[in-house]
């Protein structure tokens, strides 16, 4: 019998995002309470300082609610070589917290500094090749990703996964493929994010087929093509698309989650599935959405 997937959620579903945005997100105690209350068994860390940064204190908060700690998102401006050293330091600090709280099974979720390049942010979901990195730019980007992943592995034993993400330099299937070709498969894997790859013009199943050996971590996020079409027509930037609900509740968009479930099962994936429904701070009803998302997954056998 196939081992059932473990299902987690993340603070970003409560508006705890890496961007400097207006609005007040919920505090960590409320977020953890509501993740547990809505039927999830794990969480990602959220921004540094959102949850306690003392390992025993963080472990106590998680244990009190029966939650596992899985990963932490670390954005770095990888296209800028001058940012690599500071990015490595942040990744190592974060990796040590993960390791000392929850052991060696956690991941650093490395990403571009999404939302920081105006052209990519303004054209999220509709970027053209001309908006991408040059060959030299790709070498710098991959150099930074390899450097950080190798340092994390060598100094903490943790593995790193790269998160393709709209409003960054790795958004489209071609950009994902380019990064994977340029990076070390021994230390850097890939997050499959079902919503971001669709927003970026791709297909989750095709991404799974293309990069099966590199997919070590999975984010379940739905995608509303009607909002994407409106974003194109009205030239919304990435944050405008988020505000209008581009990442809708699971089962209400275009992602074929039963097919993704079957593909993950077929490839022998044994990691976590993390539900993420990115919302802006103070918007939406996160607990109710989390419950509906969990109910949807139960309805498809997850």
Segment roles from a protein language model:
Residues 1-20, 75, 116-128, 235-244:
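N-terminal small/glycine-rich loop or linker at the start of catalytic domains
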Residues 1-104, 139-140, 146-147, 185, ...:
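N-terminal pre-domain/capping segments
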Residues 18-25, 138, 173, 198-269, ...:
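Gly/Pro-rich active-site loop or hairpin
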Residues 42-57, 77-89, 166-172, 194-202, ...:
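Acidic-and-aromatic substrate-binding clefts and catalytic sites of carbohydrate-active enzymes
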Residues 44, 71, 107-109, 161, ...:
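Conserved beta-strand positions in the central sheet of alpha/beta enzyme cores
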Residues 55-59, 120-123, 168-185, 200-209, ...:
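Distinct, well-ordered alpha-helical segments
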Residues 83-190:
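Active-site acidic/histidine proton-transfer and metal-coordination neighborhood
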């Amino acid at each position: 019998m196939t081992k059932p997937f473990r299902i987690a959620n993340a603070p970003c579903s409560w508006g705890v995002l890496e961007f400097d945005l207006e609005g007040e997100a919920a505090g960590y105690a409320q977020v953890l309470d509501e993740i547990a209350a809505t039927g999830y068994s794990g969480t990602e860390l959220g921004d540094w300082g959102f949850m306690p940064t003392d390992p025993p204190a963080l472990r106590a908060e998680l244990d009190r609610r029966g939650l596992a700690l899985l990963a932490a998102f670390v954005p770095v401006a990888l296209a800028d070589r001058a940012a690599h050293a500071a990015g490595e330091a942040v990744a190592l600090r974060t990796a040590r917290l993960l390791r000392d709280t929850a052991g060696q099974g956690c991941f650093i979720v490395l990403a571009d500094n999404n939302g920081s390049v105006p052209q990519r942010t303004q054209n999220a979901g509709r970027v053209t090749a001309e908006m991408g990195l040059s060959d030299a730019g790709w070498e710098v980007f991959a150099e930074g990703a390899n450097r950080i992943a190798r340092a994390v592995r060598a100094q903490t034993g943790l593995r790193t996964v790269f998160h393709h993400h709209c409003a960054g330099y790795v958004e489209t299937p071609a950009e994902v493929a380019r990064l994977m070709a340029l990076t070390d498969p021994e230390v850097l894997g890939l997050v499959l994010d079902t919503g971001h790859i669709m927003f970026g013009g791709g297909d989750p199943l095709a991404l799974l087929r293309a990069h099966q050996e590199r997919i070590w971590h999975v984010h379940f996020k739905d995608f509303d093509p009607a909002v994407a079409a409106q974003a194109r027509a009205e030239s919304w930037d990435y944050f405008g698309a988020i505000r209008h609900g581009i990442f809708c509740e699971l089962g209400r968009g275009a992602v074929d989650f039963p097919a993704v479930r079957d593909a993950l099962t077929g490839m022998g994936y044994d990691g976590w599935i993390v539900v993420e429904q990115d919302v802006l701070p103070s918007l939406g009803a996160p607990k109710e959405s989390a419950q509906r998302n969990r109910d949807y997954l139960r309805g498809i056998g997850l």
